[in-house]
């Protein structure tokens, strides 16, 4: 028992040492946010032409809400182009997305399964159908809802010269149960006390699943999304940081998503 207790103690110390530096991030937004915000406000945002990328599998219940929130953006709608990849759908996701005003592609492949392959297919279609490309590409999950100023806030940060920008994820259903509340608190910590703090300190943030933007330069370098791990967002972040790029954080780009219910199985 003494050996087991000592092993547990050593593991606990190692994990504490690995995570302790994050406590130093907590006061950073309080100390630096106003100064950085004043500098950012003095910079003029340049209008950019964006492609919105949505990969959806059997999301007929929510896809129209996301597209509706995109159409309600304060950003110039002529510079916003919505593309949906209906991935192995057995419902009417594609029809609903089309009726909501999106350009829809469909994919049926039961071997290469996952969001990474779906994004690769969607970007390959855009490469063929829109050879002029876009200034930036913004990735969302189908169950997201956006604050009306989301795209404008992302564009302000993108206009500062960053090739990759991530946003402030939040929850649509914090109070449903302890799991959704836990996820929501995690997103608060990740956005406010990790990504925001890192951005204020001039280091790189990380992309997390949904609500991120990358430039045409990134796409030209990597090709149509070669990131296929289960955690393709982390794979993408690490790859780009190793290439010398920083992932920036847009602190006022609020995105809301539904979090898992206790009665729901986790979906792959």
Locations of regions flagged by a protein language model:
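Cell-envelope/extracellular polymer assembly enzymes that use nucleotide-activated donors
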Residues: 48-51, 81, 235
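Acidic helix N-cap motif at the loop->helix transition within catalytic regions
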Residues: 64, 91-98, 106, 149
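Short, acidic, metal-binding catalytic loop of nucleotide-sugar glycosyltransferases
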Residues: 68-79
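A conserved acidic beta->alpha catalytic loop
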Residues: 86-94, 109-111, 145
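Acidic donor-binding/catalytic loop of UDP-sugar-dependent glycosyltransferases
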Residues: 92, 140-156
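Long helical/loop segments within the catalytic core of UDP-sugar-dependent glycosyltransferases
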Residues: 108-130, 149-230
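Residue-level detector of conserved catalytic or cofactor/ligand-binding positions
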Residues: 257-268
């Amino acid at each position: 028992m003494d050996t087991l207790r000592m092993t547990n103690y050593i593991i606990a110390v190692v994990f504490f040492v690995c995570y302790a530096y994050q406590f130093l991030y907590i006061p950073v937004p309080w100390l630096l946010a106003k100064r950085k915000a004043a500098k950012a406000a003095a910079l003029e945002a340049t209008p950019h032409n964006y492609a919105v990328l949505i990969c959806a599998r059997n999301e007929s219940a929510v896809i129209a809400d996301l597209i509706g929130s995109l159409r309600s953006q304060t950003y110039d709608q002529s510079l916003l182009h919505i593309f949906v990849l209906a991935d192995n759908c057995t419902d009417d996701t594609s029809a609903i997305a089309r009726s909501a005003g999106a350009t829809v592609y469909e994919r049926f492949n039961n071997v290469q399964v996952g969001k990474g392959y779906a994004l690769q297919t969607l970007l390959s279609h855009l490469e063929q159908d829109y050879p002029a490309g876009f200034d930036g590409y913004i990735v969302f999950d189908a169950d997201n809802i956006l604050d009306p100023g989301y795209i404008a806030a992302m564009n302000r940060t993108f206009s500062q010269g960053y090739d990759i920008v991530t946003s402030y994820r939040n929850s649509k259903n914090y109070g449903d149960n302890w799991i959704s509340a836990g996820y929501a608190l995690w997103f608060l910590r990740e956005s406010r006390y990790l990504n925001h703090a890192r951005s204020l300190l001039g280091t790189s943030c990380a992309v997390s699943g949904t609500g991120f933007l990358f430039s045409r330069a990134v796409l030209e370098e990597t090709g149509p999304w070669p990131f296929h791990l289960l955690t393709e967002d982390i794979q993408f972040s690490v790859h780009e940081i190793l290439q010398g790029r920083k992932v920036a954080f847009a602190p006022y780009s609020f995105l809301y998503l539904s979090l898992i219910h206790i009665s729901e199985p986790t979906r792959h």
